[in-house]
Each structure stands twice: as C-alpha cells, then as structure tokens.
Amino acid sequence: MVTPVSISNYISLPDDFPVRNIAPQVKEVLKDFIDALSTIICNEEWRTSLNINSATKKIFNNLDNLSYIQRTSFRGNDTLYNEKVQFKLTYPARNGRHKENIEFQVVINLSPIYLDNFRHDGEINIFCAPNPKPVTMGRVFQTGVERVLFLFLNDFIEQFPMINPGVPIKRAHTPHIEPLPSDHHTAADYLRQFDLLVLNFISRGNFVILPRLWNNSEVHRWFVNKDPNLITAILDITDSELKEDLLQSLMDSLGSNKHVLPEVCICFLSLLAEQESPHFQNLFLFFANMLLHYHQFMNPNESDLNDVLMPASLSDDKIIKHMARRTLKLFVKNETPPKVTHEDLVKNRPRSPVRPPIPATAKTPDLPERH
C-alpha cells in the first residue's frame, strides 16, 4: 500500500463560492472527505475487506462508521452490481457560548454498473441527521457542507470512471470487471487517477489552487510527471479567464514558498527538455517568468539551464526567443540581480503567461486586484 498524500491541502474555497455565509469548517470537512476517498482508492486492503483495522481507521481522522455494501440484481440478461459506500462526518458548530455536534450521513451509491459499457447511473445522498436543537450556525454549516460535497461527489461518480477511457477501474467484490494489468494496478495508479479527478473538479471553477505551504516531495509529485502534471492540466483548460487565474494562483503560491523553488527549477528543466511538447511555449514562459523574478532562490544548474535556453534562443517564436536571450544574458554575464523586497513582489508580482506580451523592460506590469 502507498500512503496517499492528500491533495486536499491544495484546495480552498474562493470568495465567490455559490453558497453564502459558509462556515470556515467546511474546508475541513472537504479535506477529511477527500482524504477518505483517496484512502479508499489507494488502500487495496480496505477495498477488499469490510474490516477496518485501527491503523487504517486513523487515516480517516474523524470519519466514523465507514462501510461498503455490495448487492447483486438482475435486469433482463444483465447482472447489476449495486455498490454503496457510506460514512458519517461529525463536526462541532458554535453559536455564542453554545457548542453542538452536527452529524452528516454521506451515502455514495455507485449503481447500477452495466456490463457492456461500464456506465454509472449513480446517485448521491447527503443529509444531516435530525437535530432537535439546530443552531443558526449549524444550519449555515449544513448548507455549505451539503453544497460542497454534492459538487465534489457529482464529479467523483460521473467522471472518475472516464478519466482513463477504455481501462476499467477494478472495484472490490465486482467480479465482472477485469482487473487492471499488473503494471497498472498499484496504489499510485489509483492515486494518479484521483489527482486527475480533483484537477478536473478544480478546472470547472468550483475551487482554486492556493496551497499555503509546499514541500519538496509535493513539488516532485505535482510536477515531475511529464504528462499529465499539475501545470499541463491547467493549460488544457479551455476557459481562458479561469486558466489565467489558476496559473497566477500557482505562480503566487510557488513564489511564496521560496524553500521549494530549487526543486521547482529542477522539475521544470526536466519538463522543458522535450521541446516537442504541445505545451512547451506556455511551460517555457511560465518558467522564464519565475526564473527572472526568483532566480536568486531557484539556483538553477548552469548546464541544464543552457540545454533549455540555447535551443529556445533560436526559436522561431519571437516571444520564446526574446525571453530565452534575456535569461541567457542574465546568467552568462553573471549579472547580480537587484534585491527584490517583499513590497516589490506585492506591487510587481510575476504575471502568469497565458497570452503574454513581449516584455520590454525588467519590470513586470501591475496586475489588477482580483475580486
């Protein structure tokens, strides 16, 4: 078993989320819920047994009564395997001096599954257990949690089986679905598919990427894979405004975690080694903007950097050529970069290069305030 590294740390509610007065604990509910799903997907032991040992149960934090139910039914010549996962979420709600626990019963019906095309006609049930003394905060909290979980569960049921078309996902106690080949049947594969689900959820505008703290292993996980990875998944988004917002959030987030920038540099140099990549231009411009503003922290390897910059400086693309030569000039001449203060970064943060203009000066244009 591969211990899942929760992606929920990289998800936060935007200001314009379509539910008013959401309690701050909603994010914690979603975090625990996503952690639970990632464990369900990755833990072979759990998916093949109804018994949850104490070590596994600790991963679920405050999840209680987690269970898996599977029934068989028949429709004509088809055999239907009705699967259901259910569990409870218990969270405190405060109203002045009063504190009460609110219990959510979450039921995920993955049914029925047809033999011919692995189609899900599943439904989602999320409800709050009867509470004789609901507090005002509790009702607001309930509304927020139900909305958040419904959005995510809807994506989970409808899109998870389709993330890797043609490769059925092995399900516990479901004999008619062929298991994944041995080289594609590891916890890491399930975790990768779950990552893609979350990225898809993010790309629909329900959430924005805004990690508060990165570490090297997380950077490696999100960027080391050439396809797909976090930034290429964002670049595949067709909504230009959303794409630019996500890239800007990502750049701001990485820039505020300078301790991981050397690892970010290594990962991007590896990605840019293949110039035939369909995302090469945007990847290069994103990296070049990061490098020009944070190179005193990124500490690039000179040889690897030249392997990327020299061919790029001969590119037919004027923007790539300009950025490559500008970056080469900075490093070849060993120019000492001006010290950038925190106030400077706030005023002139690097711009995410979705459709960047040819930069004329070293100063990054001011971005309008986002609302």
UniProtKB/Swiss-Prot annotation:
It comes from the Bacteria. Residues 339-371 are annotated as: Disordered. This is Uncharacterized protein YneK. It comes from Escherichia coli (strain K12).
